[in-house]
């Protein structure tokens, strides 16, 4: 089992990601996103939108076990982050989640 918080920090340092609902949806629609991670407390309407676009683009979506505050903290930010799209995993092994279930 990988430590998702640690892997997110590795992606932030060595790869590329986008944070936020609009930017993540844009990355999904442009075909840039390889993996989408959503906080557990994302509102249902946003969750449905992200999941719909991800399904159309065949991008795996995972639910982070924590809240948006905790997801923001995992990325060393002092604000909420509801959705993160992984563009380039860098040196992390976060893409191993693409074959699993919820995080």
Swiss-Prot record:
Recorded GO MF terms: RNA binding; structural constituent of ribosome
Species assigned in the record: Caldivirga maquilingensis (strain ATCC 700844 / DSM 13496 / JCM 10307 / IC-167)
HAMAP family: Ribosomal_eL30
Gene: rpl30e
One Gene Ontology term, aspect cellular component: cytosolic large ribosomal subunit
Keywords from the named record: Ribonucleoprotein, Ribosomal protein
UniProt record similarity statement: Belongs to the eukaryotic ribosomal protein eL30 family.
Entries under InterPro entries matching the protein: Ribosomal_eL30, Ribosomal_eL30-like, Ribosomal_eL30-like_sf, Ribosomal_eL8/eL30/eS12/Gad45
Pfam family for this entry, one: Ribosomal_L7Ae
GO biological process: translation
Span of the signal peptide: none
The name this protein goes by in its record: Large ribosomal subunit protein eL30
